[in-house]
Amino acid sequence: MASLINQAAWQPKARTRSLQVGPGPTPSPNEHEIVIKVAYAAVNPTDWKMQDTPYFELEYPFIWGTDVAGTIVQLGSEVTQFKVGQRVIGHCDSLLTRKVTNAGFQLYTTVREILVAEIPDSLPLANAAVLPLSVSTAASALYVQLDLPFPSLSPKSTGKRIVIWGGSSSVGSSAIQLAVASGLEVVATASQANHDLVRSLGASQVFDHRAPSVIDQMASVLQPGDYVVDCIGSPDTQAKCGELVGRIGGGTLPVMLWPQGGLPQNVRAVFVNGLDPGMVNLDVGNAVWRKFIPEALAAGKFQAKPDPRIVPGGLEKVQEGIDMLRQGVSAQKIVIEISRSE
């Protein structure tokens, strides 16, 4: 096929809040990669955190961006499950590969096949863009760290409960739905304004995380052997979740922030790597990305939540979207309109 003319929003150097739009890398997929024309790309906390204080050294200029939704334009030679023209979501992994071709904030991105899922025509691409990183991260917490049963459209009850701390967050929204599809009863936290949203995702009980007695309230409905996941990733939420796990007999606590220490001795905090399902535990990637997510979206049994807050205007607006998220949002995800595809 003819060479694709790409454009990208580049980070010119470390620790600067000014992206520059210019020619992007030419996509050249390996045998197991897919080239997606990006219609929408979501912004995640990693984007502004890497812009302000990078976790590790990178060669600049670089391109951020993890969540994309768009249309397949090219397939690697060994890709058989997909076809050109399909509407898909993709989890971009440039922070792992260190390759800008694998980043999301560009017109064409290259994504590994196991982290791509077809979406139904009924799901707008802008809404679908909120899903990739949240699905992968929630899947890593539930199926890698906690070893829960894989999700199913017809789950069997495990008789267990799981606390999703931060139920209206992006990761929390996916974690609630995956946990329900794995046969668990979900107990969640959220601000009072977001209780209805969290219940609509499948939580049977929702507690106000600001309530002084929230730990006591939640501990009263849990039993030893139940689970807790911190989907917020702050020192405060990690400490509260650790206390809760300790109160019900101890166990593993998946966290979105490196373990901070100071937790009860019977609690083992483990950092959740959102790229694990596509890199290491491929059985998780296959069960979630290849099987469950496409089927559940098509059947209307998985919601793309939280709702997108769409920023139109193309790649020139990526920095604006990053700045908006840096200031904070609630029960929304910032989504940039990269190109007009629908």
UniProtKB/Swiss-Prot annotation:
The keyword Transcription does not apply. Its EC number is 1.-.-.-. CDD domains: enoyl_reductase_like. It comes from the Eukaryota. It is an enzyme of class 1 (oxidoreductase). Keywords: NADP, Nucleotide-binding, Oxidoreductase. InterPro entries: ADH-like_C, ADH-like_N, GroES-like_sf, NAD(P)-bd_dom_sf, PKS_ER, Trans-enoyl_RdTase-like. Disulfide bonds: none annotated. It holds the Pfam family ADH_N. Trans-enoyl reductase; part of the him gene cluster that mediates the biosynthesis of himeic acid A, a ubiquitin-activating enzyme (E1) inhibitor. First, himA, together with the trans-enoyl reductase himH, catalyzes the formation of apolyketide chain, which is then condensed with leucine by the NRPS activity of himA. Dieckmann cyclization and release from himA gives a tetramic acid intermediate as the product of himA PKS-NRPS. HimG then catalyzes alpha-oxidation of the tetramic acid ring, with a subsequent rearrangement to yield apyrone intermediate. PANTHER family: HYPOTHETICAL OXIDOREDUCTASE (EUROFUNG), ZINC-TYPE ALCOHOL DEHYDROGENASE-LIKE PROTEIN C2E1P3.01. Belongs to the zinc-containing alcohol dehydrogenase family. This is Trans-enoyl reductase himH. It comes from Aspergillus japonicus.
